[in-house]
Amino acid sequence: MAHKKAGGSSRNGRDSKAKRLGIKRFGGELVSAGSILVRQRGTPFHAGENVGMGKDHTLFATATGKVSFSIRGAEKRRFVSVEEIQS
């Protein structure tokens, strides 16, 4: 019975690629319809006015306008909205 483990079999060496999550457009920025505002896992940010949510919880603008962030409700939820600009 060997008392030393055979060399050359490391159990390390794996890592996952970064997912590039986070806020993509900040408050006050002008965005066009379809622009991605936030990439997230779950819903740290909720969809407000003129904002849609994709199946992976990505928030995107449904209208052209200015991005705004707000905290609303008893649960103090963070909402992302787009204030529509009339053109």
Swiss-Prot record:
This is Large ribosomal subunit protein bL27. Belongs to the bacterial ribosomal protein bL27 family. One of its GO terms (cellular component) is cytosolic large ribosomal subunit. Signal peptide: none annotated. It holds the Pfam family Ribosomal_L27. GO terms for molecular function: structural constituent of ribosome. The keyword Ribosomal protein applies. InterPro entries: Ribosomal_bL27, Ribosomal_bL27_CS. PROSITE patterns: RIBOSOMAL_L27. Keywords: Ribonucleoprotein, Ribosomal protein. It comes from the Bacteria. Gene3D superfamilies: 2.40.50.100. GO terms for biological process: translation. The keyword Ribosomal protein applies. It comes from Dichelobacter nodosus (strain VCS1703A).
